[in-house]
Amino acid sequence: GLPYPKGVLLVGVQGTGKSIAAKIIASEWELPLLRLDFGRLFASLVGQSELRVRKMIQIAEALSPCILWVDEIDKAFAGAQSSGDSGTTSRVLATFITWLAEKTSPVFVIATANNIDWIPPEVIRKGRFDEVFFLALPTREERQAIFEVHLSKFRPGKERNFEIGLLSELSKDFSGAEIEQVVIEAMRLGFNENREFTTEDLIISIQKSVPLAKTKSKELKALKEWAESGNVARASKY
């Protein structure tokens, strides 16, 4: 007798695996994954944007059960409080959240966001999503696991040749996506010298990289404070 789950909102800085989480959920549940780019729904003609939203809803419900992945929902509604678009953003927002709150079809919504300040309070309010998860930067244990994943992908069976414990210590504040780029850059260093890349190449790559957490430290701090002050679940088990 339980109603169908509405969905989840995944909030975190870029590169923490929000998009990957959406794809993994769809794979685990063996359901089709529909990706919605809200930016493409907005049109210049009055009323056309709302019509596109309703069309999107019709398609999702016709394909249900399915997963609707709303990527970077914060950017879509960043202008909801302004009057520069003649209220189009507000009307699109109203259409979407009304459907989200009242829908009875088995469409599971996974929305991702980088900047919580851009998300209207109506979207986060109880009853819209079943849960709001905060995806923090990976811990040392998680960074070690991420290095293992990428090293085993690029050098199957040889990941133990690298000092992964040391690498996880040196890559503090790196996101999962940034760790992947560290590995790719180290591979380039080895390729340029016609040899296999080593732990030393990975260390050099780490030292040359400036993680987003450093360049946007204020935004990250605000995001952490928001996560700690509200009814938000942490996605990490550590």
Q: Residues of each region from the PLM?
A:
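C-terminal engagement/docking regions of AAA+ P-loop ATPases
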Residues: G1-P5, V13-T16, I20-A21, Q58, ...
